[in-house]
């Protein structure tokens, strides 16, 4: 296991701990919005800001954990793992700061959250992967190696499909997209025909009815 793989595992643990705090906060709001054991949606209007903050936290955590899981499968891709660790570190900082700010509102123990903030692993991840120098090195590598995207983990067949759609998007759609959106124009035939040739229509219609979805 590489050092970056180890750090990704540590980051996952930290992310999971924050996720539990978010769930505790959600349970607190649910309790406050319940009447006679039933959830009252009208009461939730009084909790719009905390609910928004928690939704944002959960979205960030889910994205970071998904990125981490993906990167752990690519043990030979140093850059991918470094980028994932940078994203995880940024997410840890963002979510924890948001929870600390809303702790009283959502029934969390601010002292416990601050203990997490001073935790050894948390500080190590931030100091290592959220530092200005590290972010600068990632940017330099992206520019220097002309990195356009990360490994897809797709099969050879699906990678060919991805590349085909990528070329269509860049060679056919991109040159026309601004004009279409800016002036609210109809989608031209060149795009519709190309999309049809790629099988973009009828994907949810069973084959027995002339669609592309397997019966």
PLM regions with names:
Residues 1-213:
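Flavin-dependent oxidoreductase catalytic core characteristic
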């Amino acid at each position: 296991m590489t050092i970056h793989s180890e750090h990704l595992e540590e980051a996952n643990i930290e992310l999971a701990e924050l996720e539990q705090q978010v769930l505790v906060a959600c349970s607190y709001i649910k309790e406050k919005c319940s009447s006679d054991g039933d959830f009252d949606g009208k009461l939730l209007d009084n909790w719009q800001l905390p609910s928004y903050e928690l939704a944002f936290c959960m979205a960030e955590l889910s994205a970071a954990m998904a990125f981490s899981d993906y990167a752990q499968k690519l043990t030979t891709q140093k850059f991918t793992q470094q980028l994932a660790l940078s994203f995880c570190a940024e997410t840890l900082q963002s979510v924890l700061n948001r929870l600390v700010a809303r702790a009283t509102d959502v029934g969390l123990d601010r002292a416990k959250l601050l203990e997490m903030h001073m935790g050894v692993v948390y500080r190590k991840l931030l100091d290592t992967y959220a530092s200005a120098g590290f972010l600068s090195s990632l940017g330099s590598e992206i520019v220097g190696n002309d990195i356009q995207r990360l490994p897809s983990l797709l099969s050879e067949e699906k990678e060919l499909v991805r590349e085909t759609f990528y070329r269509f998007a860049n060679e056919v759609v991109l040159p026309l997209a601004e004009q279409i959106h800016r002036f609210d124009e109809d989608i031209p035939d060149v795009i519709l025909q190309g999309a049809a040739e790629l099988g973009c229509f009828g994907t949810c219609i069973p084959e027995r009815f002339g669609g592309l979805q397997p019966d």
